[in-house]
Amino acid sequence: MVRCKVTLSIILLIGLAMPIQAQTNLPSLTASEAHELQQAGELILIDIRQPEEWRETGMAQGAAGVSMMHPEGGQGFLRDVLAAVNGDTDANIALICRTGNRTSQVLPALQRWGFTRAKHIPEGMVGSQFGPGWIPSGLPVQPCAAC
């Protein structure tokens, strides 16, 4: 019984650590780095949260809103991301969500779809163990125009 509990605890700990491990192995930027690159015209920022979240907190200034929960599924999401980058899969893009969890799940799909310079912002809009976040860092936000 004790051995079973220990094994189960180890499996649970490994499972909980996997998202953190996945996030640290992905190409990433801090919120401040992304903001600087975006301001210089060298980065397209894509907010993959849902419209309710955009309304609640606003969006990073200049970000394209493309919800990962697209009503048309993955194909609709891909179509809208392609539209945000004018069809250029070599565009320098960064994905942002609330805390970096969703971007760490979506980024590998974009890489499989041929996006060669895609990155994510692990601290997200509100912060995580990877950093303070876009909003707490005092970076500019704007209301969602399409919400």
Model-derived features: positions:
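Rhodanese-like catalytic fold shared by cysteine-dependent sulfurtransferases
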Residues: 3, 19-40, 52-92, 101-147
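Short, surface-exposed ligand- or partner-binding patches at beta-edge/loop junctions that are enriched
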Residues: 95-96
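Bacterial N-terminal signal peptides
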Residues: 5-19
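Structural scaffold elements adjacent to functional motifs in cytosolic proteins
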Residues: 45-47
